[in-house]
Regions:
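C-terminal motif of bacterial Sec signal peptides marking the signal peptidase cleavage site
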Residues: 16-19
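Short, solvent-exposed loop/turn and secondary-structure capping segments
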Residues: 89-92, 97-100, 209-211, 284
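A metal-dependent, Asp-based hydrolase signature
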Residues: 92, 97-176, 180
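N-terminal carbohydrate-binding/catalytic regions of secreted carbohydrate-active enzymes
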Residues: 58-77, 90-91
């Protein structure tokens, strides 16, 4: 996501694109990790090709003690953008859908919202009116969904929403809108000693609410945009944090590199993104000592998912923009461009 929770992108988005073994494998003497069965394919949802080979070669090279590219266990860090990289971001970011649904849910407690902007625009579903809202108006909507809440309470509301919300096109719960090939990559990396981090422009507490369930990634390995919190003592004498209506961290563009340093303190050796909002994260990965790998997902499969760029002549989009300039930089830097159409045998676990 881009630009302070990608609020400006919303104005455009509203008008576009309507059984397991119980015996552990023996340890590999070179890597210290469990040895995989020779015939096992760690990435079964990937077609054989340059992208799959690059990932497998990278993992083998960086986990083999005899390799000059060996990366010690403490430095095995992998970063993933979320929206458009690990799950669907079209026709609009999932957090926007959450905000709109939350405003509608809270509306009975605020009768004045029916006639008060920006709430009136959302409640009436007036796309033209929403398109005219200022960034200040949009931030007011976002703040209404979390201000005054503890992080735990907010995450509880998000989990409740996730349990019932469905994607508008595929009519599937959002936890099922994750890309199966990316889940396989995450597991493959973790099986080989890598720590996997989500580095997203979305709300940090929003993603923390479901990341363990969806990705197998714990809350402390989620980096995202945040609002300020204020420490207070509860009536029961317990210290707590209360969300405030002010942006603290904007985890987009260069903010991703800055926050990786802030939260992790080390550069990643492998990074995955899909848009201009991820460019600096990949650029920050590239100078790491030893071998590194940057990968970008190109959405070029309108049949199984969506097609947008505008790189390579694909339709333009303000949601997850992948420009030709970014595509050209990827080629110049040796980053791998993952074609959804050609590199992914299967996109969703339920989709054949």
């Amino acid at each position: 996501m881009k630009t302070r929770f990608a609020v400006s992108a919303l104005l455009f988005a509203l008008l576009i694109l309507p059984g397991c073994s119980t015996n552990p494998a023996p340890a590999n003497s070179n890597t210290g990790q469990p040895a995989a069965t020779a015939a096992a394919d760690p990435l079964p949802s990937w077609n054989d090709g340059a992208a799959k080979k690059a990932i497998v070669d990278f993992v083998k090279s960086t986990t083999d003690k005899s390799s000059p590219n060996f990366v010690t266990a403490e430095d095995r860090i992998a970063t993933f953008d979320q929206d458009g990289t690990t799950w669907v971001e079209q026709p609009m970011y999932s957090q926007f859908l959450f905000v709109f649904d939350r405003i509608a849910e809270l509306a009975p407690q605020h009768p004045d919202w029916k006639t008060k902007m920006p709430y009136k625009a959302v409640l009436s579903g007036d796309k033209a009116a929403i398109a005219k809202l200022s960034i200040k108006d949009m931030l007011a909507l976002f703040n209404e969904t979390s201000t005054g809440m503890t992080p735990d309470a907010f995450q509880g509301v998000v989990r409740d929403w996730m349990a019932k919300a469905k994607h508008p096109r595929f009519d599937r719960p959002y936890p099922e809108m994750v890309y199966q090939p990316m889940l396989e990559v995450m597991k493959y990396l973790r099986d080989n000693g890598y720590r996997t981090y989500i580095v997203t422009g979305g709300g940090q507490d929003f993603v923390r609410a479901y990341a363990q369930q969806v990705y197998g990634i714990p809350p402390d390995q989620i980096i995202g945009s945040t609002v300020e919190t204020k420490f207070e003592m509860s009536k029961g004498g317990r210290g707590t944090l209360i969300k405030q209506p002010k942006i603290q961290l904007d985890d987009n563009f260069s903010g991703k590199a800055e926050d990786i340093n802030l939260f992790i303190g080390k550069r990643a050796h492998i990074a995955f993104g899909n848009s201009t909002g991820d460019q600096q994260m990949l650029e920050y990965t590239s100078p790491a000592s030893g071998v590194t790998l940057g990968l970008l997902v190109l959405h070029d499969d309108a049949t199984r998912e969506y097609a947008y760029g505008p790189a390579q002549g694909l339709p333009d989009s303000r949601v997850g923009t992948f420009t030709q300039a970014l595509y050209d930089e990827a080629k110049a830097r040796g980053w791998i461009v993952i074609s959804m159409k050609n590199d992914w045998k299967q996109i969703f676990s339920w989709q054949k």
